[in-house]
Amino acid sequence: MTTSPVTATRARGSALSAVSSPRHVVVIGAGFGGLAAAWELARRGVAVTVLESDDEVGGLAGSFDVGGTRLERFYHHWFTNDRHVNELVRELGTEDEILYRPTNTGMYFSQKFFKLSTPGDVLRFTPLSPLGRIRLGLLALRARRVKHWQVLEHLTAEEWLTQLGGREVYRVVWEPLLTGKFGPYAGEISAVWFWNKLKLRGGSRDQRGAEMLAYYRGGFAALAERLAEAIREHGGTIRLNTRATGLVMQGGRITGVKAGADVLAADAVIATPALPIVADLIEPHAPPDYVAHLRRIRYLANVCLVLELDRSLSSTYWLNVNDPSFPFVGVIEHTNFEPPETYAGRHIVYLSKYLPEESELWRMADPEVLEYSLTHLQRMFPAFSREWILGSHVWRARYSQPIVSRHYGSMIPAVETPLPGLFLTTMAQVYPEDRGTNYAIREGRKTGQVVAERLRTQRADSGIRGAEAPEPGLVGA
């Protein structure tokens, strides 16, 4: 009889940890960061409960049904060098479910389409002068020479990119992308953020220079569900449609989480939502200066229109839009990456826009977003017809992208908070990398390890929780 990797991990639980008595940890949020933290705890024999306000696990990688298959609400892929997700998938025994495929990238500039997937494409990019093309090609190589991101902390992306490639390359290629993504904050964005983008994409190419990306069979939802299943197999609990509404503090430490009328007692709590949400949760208990510190990091929201079409829009997977009059920073044709047969022959197109909450587009009703977007899409693709549309969906995320400004490293809160028993693992703490499922998994696992170690080394009489406290789990409010 063969033993599954998950079962084998459970059998090794005592070797992973020396937790001598039952402990209980509550994880707030079932995105990949929260699930990874819960998995790290559960496989060490720690009792864990995950609270998720949505009706499914996955967080920003949440999904909906298209043609009988789950599709991400917001576009997702992995790079070939995303080792943390690969390690997790191997532990779950589902590495054969990762699909690696070549993709292509393009740019829409001055009402024309250009390929930008290979070095040859760069040399044929006519919006730049011959010297500008050479500078653009060398820019990525020069950027990769930077080994220590700290030397870039004092620079904005504009300053650094102009130094590397000149003003022409910045004006044509980089400025429209920064403005399209960060809007009024484009001039504040750190060079570190852009350096990591170049480093990451440069490391996900084959020997010929073509970009390779990865996807999970059945979508990211399938991986999130498999991870949730593994947590349950190790004794963990995941409660969907359950919003954390507050924290309980006793004896100078966090001892539980409120979920409506219920309270879950806990030896430790890991909070994974966006920092403004965490700030609201802890405000009754935390020092005012710490709450203010959490609120220092600003976020952009995201509106994502997903179109189901009866035919392909173009042959490009990732189309950067370097046209300031176009409201979306990119047109991502998902089915040029994952084939349309996966979705009953439907072609999937994402139109994504990061924006402040005060923006008109954020306030539009869903039908208005569709009408507004189609006008611009038809300008870009004159042959496009509304008759191609088989379905449309508008998804919104209030806290989608932290604004990574200069000296961002000094703004990031530590995993351990001033409130004993409360730990943080959020997308805003992913740095110098940008947020994404690979790094959410990395940070979640690291936090789970920290919490497990605290529970292992501290005794009940040290203040974690006395013997007179309630048993782990649900107690009366």
Question: What does each model-identified segment do?
Answer:
Residues T3-S4, V331-A477:
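Conserved flavin/dinucleotide-binding core of flavoenzymes
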Residues R23-V50:
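N-terminal Rossmann-like FAD-binding beta1-loop-alpha1 element of flavoenzymes
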Residues G33, E56, P276:
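Conserved Rossmann-like nucleotide-cofactor binding loop
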Residues A42-V66:
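Glycine-rich FAD pyrophosphate-binding loop
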Residues G67-Q150:
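Dinucleotide-binding Rossmann-like beta1-alpha1 core, especially the glycine-rich loop
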